[in-house]
Structure formats: structure tokens, C-alpha cells
A protein has these predicted regions:
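Hydrophobic alpha-helical membrane segments
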Residues: 1-245
Length: 245
């Protein structure tokens, strides 16, 4: 299936749901930001696995429910805490540990394994009866032959962040290395501010869009006999169709 098909389907699912999607992203971002400034390093790692992990899983689950037209609410963001909390913490820990261990060997194998494990949390949502390792194994099996496609899909979002990131970098360089020149310092400051504002604005749009696209990718590749678990999606018809009741 084409990259554009996944992205078109994601936009279709978000149609009329942008408000709740952006609101959930804001809440997720605020909570994650608070957890990201701990008093010490050990507290950071504890909070990351006990709170950030289930929160991230709930954020993915929200978008999976979104593409299935289940009208998810803010409470879905916290479903990683209310549904199999300990399993979700352990799953987040294991996926991150496995990925880090592969990254310690080489960057490329680490990226490949990260792609292989990327469907784990979606699988845990659809199949709560499976163990963590079964979900990881199922994700690896599902991504067999699909990793390149997902990698290209992820790369297609990069242009959105390149320009604001470049403005931020240029601004920082100008501020720190040309402080003696008031004109260049002013240019650097303006560039930094514009880059930060653009980055925030783009993130508000991009994160719900990206995560919804990831959910579409999963739902389009999950092997299931239950039609309610997958969208009606083809290259010829890239719009998700809301099921009739």
C-alpha cells in the first residue's frame, strides 16, 4: 500500500475529530513535560517506566480507537493505567531495553529492531490475553517485510520539522557566536523565536496526524478475522469508512 494511502486515511479519520485529538495531545505533552524535569536521574527513570510508559501506550490506544470510529475520549489516554497496568509498564520496559541493547551494537540494527517492535502496544490493545513476549513476537512477525514501508512512512513526516529545526539551530548559533554583533544577535534571536513558535504549531498538527497514521498502518496490516478491527482501506479507496450501526 502507498505511503499516501495511509496518510489520507489518517486525515479521513481525524476529520471532525481534530479538537479532541489536539486536546489529548496537549494533555499528553503537558504531563510528559512535567515528568521530564525530575529532581534526580533515578526519579526520572522510575517515572519514565511507571507513568510515562502507560501514558504513551494510552496515547497510541487513543488513536487506534479514533480510526475505528469508537469516539474515544480523554479517558482513553489513561487506559494504559486502568487496563493491565503492570503488563503495560513491563511491556514499555522490555521494548525500550531491547531497542537500546540493539542500538548499543550499531545504529542501523537498532532502528530495524525499533521498527520491528513498533506494533507491540497496538497488539496489546487488541489482544489483552497475550503475554508481553507474545506481543513483541507478533509485532516482529507482522513487520516482517513491512519495516521498509514503515520507515519510508516515518521519513515522509520529516520535512515538517526540518525548517523550524533549522531556524532554531541557526538562531542558537547566531546568539552564542555573534553576541558582539547586535544585528546578527537580533537576527539570531528572531530566528530562534520563529523556529520555536513554528515547531510548537507544527507539533500540534503533526503529532496527532503522525500517531493516527501509525495506527492506520497497524490496522491495515493486522491479521484478523474480525472486520471491526480493521478499516476499509485500499489504494483505490484511501478513506476510512465509518461503520454503520
Amino acid at each position: 500500500m502507498k505511503t499516501s494511502t495511509y496518510k489520507t486515511a489518517a486525515k479521513s479519520a481525524l476529520n471532525g475529530k481534530w479538537g479532541i485529538a489536539i486536546g489529548v495531545f496537549f494533555l499528553y505533552f503537558i504531563i510528559s513535560s512535567i515528568l521530564g524535569v525530575p529532581e534526580n536521574e533515578w526519579i526520572f527513570y522510575v517515572l519514565m517506566f511507571l507513568i510515562s510508559g502507560p501514558l504513551y501506550i494510552g496515547y497510541q490506544w487513543f488513536h487506534l480507537e479514533l480510526i475505528r470510529y469508537n469516539n474515544p475520549g480523554v479517558s482513553t489516554l489513561f487506559s494504559g493505567f486502568t487496563q493491565n497496568y503492570l503488563r503495560n509498564v513491563a511491556a514499555y520496559f522490555m521494548v525500550n531495553i531491547f531497542t537500546i541493547l540493539w542500538l548499543l551494537l550499531l545504529i542501523v540494527p537498532g532502528i530495524i529492531k525499533a521498527l520491528a517492535y513498533s506494533m507491540t502496544y497496538f497488539i496489546l490493545r487488541d489482544r489483552p490475553e497475550v503475554s508481553i513476549f507474545q506481543a513483541i513476537t507478533e509485532s516482529r512477525r507482522m513487520m516482517d517485510g513491512q519495516k521498509k514501508k514503515l520507515f519510508i512512512l516515518i521519513l515522509s513526516f520529516l520535512p515538517w520539522v526540518i525548517i523550524p529545526s533549522a531556524l532554531i539551530i541557526i538562531g542558537l548559533i547566531a546568539i552564542f557566536f555573534t553576541a558582539s554583533d547586535p544585528i546578527l544577535f537580533l537576527v539570531g534571536t528572531v530566528s530562534l523565536i520563529i523556529g520555536l513558535i513554528a515547531n510548537i504549531g507544527i507539533s500540534i498538527y503533526l503529532m496527532p496526524y503522525f500517531t493516527t497514521t501509525l495506527a492506520v498502518f497497524y490496522a491495515s496490516n493486522v491479521p484478523t478475522s474480525d472486520p471491526s478491527l480493521e478499516p476499509l482501506l485500499t489504494d483505490e479507496n484511501p478513506n476510512l469508512v465509518e461503520p454503520t450501526q
